[in-house]
Amino acid sequence: MSKPPDLLLRLLRGAPRQRVCTLFIIGFKFTFFVSIMIYWHVVGEPKEKGQLYNLPAEIPCPTLTPPTPPSHGPTPGNIFFLETSDRTNPNFLFMCSVESAARTHPESHVLVLMKGLPGGNASLPRHLGISLLSCFPNVQMLPLDLRELFRDTPLADWYAAVQGRWEPYLLPVLSDASRIALMWKFGGIYLDTDFIVLKNLRNLTNVLGTQSRYVLNGAFLAFERRHEFMALCMRDFVDHYNGWIWGHQGPQLLTRVFKKWCSIRSLAESRACRGVTTLPPEAFYPIPWQDWKKYFEDINPEELPRLLSATYAVHVWNKKSQGTRFEATSRALLAQLHARYCPTTHEAMKMYL
């Protein structure tokens, strides 16, 4: 039978008060560890899983209007979506995100990179979401090879090292790393899969969004290929890595780097410098995460254009809102956004929810 570590035995043999403190610390650490495991078991599993059962594997494609070639403006770049888990069954919000981007950017390639997709010439999984998104001629579903993505970047050694250890927020941290690597290597536009795109984003270059007066957010990024700002983000990711603090490698990283980039101490001091611009919250985060329930409240349809006149895309805060049910035909804000900006997904929701 193995013996307890000597240090632990010495601590337990100490004075009663010391023993109480020791046991309290051990109990706290154990409780903290278990809490994290339970949290990720609950949050990490999609709460809408029940909505995806008994759905058909395929859906008839709608009649789509051929895109009108752009007459002016910058050369269109790629639009990227990422799925860094092994899931290959997009939920309805995921479908709406990609569809809305495809409809507002008919001239661009919309690339959905999914870690769970097989490589080579393997066929795509049979699933309603895959079938629906494949209807759009400018959407491509591609396998995500993280090792290849991080190759020849400062993130390569970090990724190799993190493979051998457990961290509480590894999945979102992988997503944080992947998006800045994508922007560095390829440029274009990155969007989280809980956005609904309202307008064409082609005129936004070297831009990111402000979440609040104190922090930026990387759920939307638009950068030129090999921009130095993204290079600094990758270096900061490795140099100041802490996978145990939520957001440290994502929003907080972008905020840190932007402050260094502009030599400022507060975001209020500058919205743009050295060719990088931050847009105000209403551009991409018109409803703060604390008020996410507003997406499920009824709204007068006539008010929608006025409320979102300064908004390019709406972030729905899926981490908070996932699993919240709503009627697809209701006057809820989210239902109206689906109906207007991702009508094919909306029709599927009306049929199968």
From Swiss-Prot:
Keyword Glycosyltransferase appears in the UniProt entry: yes
Compartments, record wording: Golgi apparatus membrane
GO BP annotations listed: globoside biosynthetic process; glycosphingolipid biosynthetic process; plasma membrane organization
Enzyme Commission number(s) of this protein: 2.4.1.228
Lumenal side: 44-353
Domain of life of the source: Eukaryota
Reaction(s) catalysed by this chain's protein: a beta-D-Gal-(1->4)-beta-D-Glc-(1<->1)-Cer(d18:1(4E)) + UDP-alpha-D-galactose = a globoside Gb3Cer (d18:1(4E)) + UDP + H(+); a beta-D-Gal-(1<->1')-ceramide + UDP-alpha-D-galactose = alpha-D-Gal-(1->4)-beta-D-Gal-(1<->1')-Cer + UDP + H(+)
Enzyme class: transferase
Transmembrane segment boundaries: 23-43
Cytoplasmic-side positions: 1-22
UniProt keyword list: Glycoprotein, Glycosyltransferase, Golgi apparatus, Lipid biosynthesis, Lipid metabolism, Membrane, Signal-anchor, Transferase, Transmembrane, Transmembrane helix
Protein name, as recorded: Lactosylceramide 4-alpha-galactosyltransferase
UniProt source species: Homo sapiens (Human)
